Amino acid sequence: MRHGKVHRKLNRTAEHRRAMFANMAAALIKHEQIVTTLPKAKELRPIVEKLVTLGKKGGLAMRRQAISEMRDKDQVKKLFDVLATRYKDRQGGYTRIIKAGFRYGDNAAMAVIEFVDRDVDAKGQDSGPVQEKEAEAA
């Protein structure tokens, strides 16, 4: 029986889900808006909300807890420095999910998950490894 089982399995092992949501949370904090499937967005929302609450609490123990959940120190720094100050007066509800139609290949329901009052310029910034240094050296 499924009594008390509230989370979706998403056809993945527990380790895969944990790693996937850690990566998705880091991507959402980095870009402040990501496009994913609707069930993944609905599962990601409480994870990110709890991370923002950790950032608002501040302190070394909360920072270490966020690092253990997200495994990306740069995004934890942004979480504690930028997002915590942005949402210091908001009591929850830091993210929104907007339905975005259906994916062409498999007709999966897609959604945009983004931060409320997000920085529009953050989207697409600092994506991937820097390749300008290699071009300057050549």
From Swiss-Prot:
Keywords: Ribonucleoprotein, Ribosomal protein. GO terms for molecular function: structural constituent of ribosome. One of its GO terms (biological process) is translation. Coiled coil: none annotated. Signal peptide: none annotated. GO terms for cellular component: cytosolic large ribosomal subunit. Disulfide bonds: none annotated. SUPFAM superfamilies: Prokaryotic ribosomal protein L17 (SSF64263). Belongs to the bacterial ribosomal protein bL17 family. Part of the 50S ribosomal subunit. Contacts protein L32. NCBIfam families: L17. This is Large ribosomal subunit protein bL17.
